[in-house]
UniProtKB/Swiss-Prot annotation:
UniProt name for this protein: Alpha-2B adrenergic receptor
Record's signal peptide: none
Biased segments, Acidic residues type: 303-314
Region Disordered, annotated ranges: 214-329
Sites annotated Implicated in ligand binding: D97
Cytoplasmic compartment residues: 43-54, 114-135, 199-375, 433-453
GO CC terms in record: cell surface; plasma membrane
Keywords assigned: Cell membrane, Disulfide bond, G-protein coupled receptor, Lipoprotein, Membrane, Palmitate, Receptor, Transducer, Transmembrane, Transmembrane helix
Gene it is expressed from: Adra2b
Residue spans crossing the bilayer: 18-42, 55-80, 91-113, 136-158, 175-198, 376-399, 409-432
């Protein structure tokens, strides 16, 4: 089907048409390239293979569909001033437009809920956060978007007369549909996301305050500890689980018998003795050397990369200093204390590698979760800024069509600002997330190297 043969006034001058066409063509290409890069990064980068990143793959796919199936036809409709294509395709085009836009914001809503559950119910939810579960949530997101986008195909509403006899392709103008679709596609998910992120902020703030209190408490406790004796080991230090037959030498020399220590194999009463983070200043040097070779290169490397962005407050289950493990009585004889220290080095050398490796991995994971939550907050904020003007003016026209209608030119500007959002997520990931930065650099450099050869 071809367009009408009649002559009509073009909406833009030749220069404006060329500029708009060039800008939108660049937008289309950049959107496809950037979001394809996001999909490749998640599927090929080890640091981005977490199940929750499948949300980003689906979101990027929706943005690519907007760039390929929606924006080109919107551009033609804008520049020509009428709908050049088949009437049936107009109805499908409008339904797909609503589908992809709704899918994007419902994806962001699902991501924010995933963040909230990961923060508020970390142990319980992380064990259930499997790829299969995430895929089911993504399928539900697309089904919700499809339900909201179906009415334009089923009920077309009252058809307005076409100006100058030219075919037009416009959104449903029924007030009930405008309000229902705006609430379901934008305002309700936005409200959910805002409330969820406020809750995440409250939880993070509370954890931060608890962490500062724990730090102050540990600082006061350390200030009361006795100064270390010769050799760098505190004079009051002992390792629980250490008992030596040579401790009887102290009794034979006239020293009082020290209090009973726990037998090997018993669980220490101090819960902090169960996990030893790598606080080097508090560990014997031989243990430090042992730790350097046994803690796992991958965990240390990840922690070093995230060092500048590590959370200020660690969970309270992670002890602030391994020095808290050592806490023996002052009257313990020197011979027994030295022997206990030596045996303590042997004991620590067996366990510190595993414990501190787990500590580093947990620390790196928490840092990555924190940064990823911040990135998603930026993504949601940018989405709201881009789409709010359109949905607000669209709803306003349905509430009071006579007096509150937004001028057509301004409405079209809001319309295109919303489309621009599809190209922004890859930029946000690049600016705010070093895992994506490294993955993008690796993919692009590999492609350029292969092309150069």
């Amino acid at each position: 089907m071809s367009g009408p043969a009649m002559v009509h006034q073009e909406p833009y001058s030749v220069q404006a048409t060329a500029a708009i066409a060039s800008a939108i063509t660049f937008l289309i290409l950049f959107t496809i390239f950037g979001n394809a890069l996001v999909i490749l990064a998640v599927l090929t980068s080890r640091s981005l293979r977490a199940p929750q990143n499948l949300f980003l793959v689906s979101l990027a796919a929706a943005d690519i569909l907007v760039a390929t199936l929606i924006i080109p036809f919107s551009l033609a409709n804008e520049l020509l001033g009428y709908w050049y294509f088949w009437r049936a395709w107009c109805e499908v085009y409008l339904a797909l437009d609503v589908l992809f836009c709704t899918s994007s914001i419902v994806h962001l809503c699902a991501i924010s809920l995933d963040r909230y559950w990961a923060v508020s119910r970390a142990l319980e939810y992380n064990s259930k956060r499997t790829p299969r579960r995430i895929k089911c949530i993504i399928l539900t997101v697309w089904l919700i978007a499809a339900v909201i986008s179906l009415p334009p195909l089923i009920y077309k509403g009252d058809q307005r007369p076409e100006p100058h006899g030219l075919p037009q392709c416009e959104l449903n103008q029924e007030a009930w549909y405008i309000l229902a679709s705006s609430i379901g596609s934008f305002f309700a998910p936005c409200l959910i996301m805002i409330l969820v992120y406020l809750r995440i902020y409250v939880i993070a703030k509370r954890s931060h305050c608890r962490g500062l209190g724990a730090k102050r408490g540990s600082g006061e406790g350390e200030s009361k500890k006795p100064h270390p004796a010769a050799g760098g080991v505190p004079a009051s230090a002992k390792v629980p689980t250490l008992v030596s037959p040579l401790s009887s030498v102290g009794e034979a020399n006239g020293h009082p018998k020290p209090p009973r220590e726990k037998e090997e194999g018993e669980t220490p009463e101090d819960p902090e003795a169960r996990a030893l983070p790598p606080n080097w200043s508090a560990l014997p040097r031989s243990v430090q050397d042992q730790k350097k070779g046994t803690s796992g290169a991958t965990a240390e490397k990840g922690a070093e990369e995230d060092e500048e962005e590590v959370e200020e407050c660690e969970p309270q289950t992670l002890p602030a200093s391994p020095a808290s493990v050592f806490n023996p009585p002052l009257q313990q004889p020197q011979t027994s204390r030295v022997l206990a220290t030596l045996r303590g080095q042997v004991l620590l050398s067996k366990n510190v590698g595993v414990a501190s490796g787990q500590w580093w991995r947990r620390r790196t994971q928490l840092s990555r979760e924190k940064r990823f939550t911040f990135v998603l907050a930026v993504v949601i904020g940018v989405f709201v800024v881009c789409w709010f003007p359109f949905f607000f003016s669209y709803s306003l026209g349905a509430i009071c069509p006579q007096h509150c209608k937004v001028p057509h030119g301004l409405f079209q500007f809001f319309f295109w600002i919303g489309y621009c959002n599809s190209s922004l997520n890859p930029v946000i990931y690049t600016i705010f997330n070093q895992d994506f930065r490294r993955a993008f650099r690796r993919i692009l450099c590999r492609q350029w190297t292969q092309t150069g050869w």
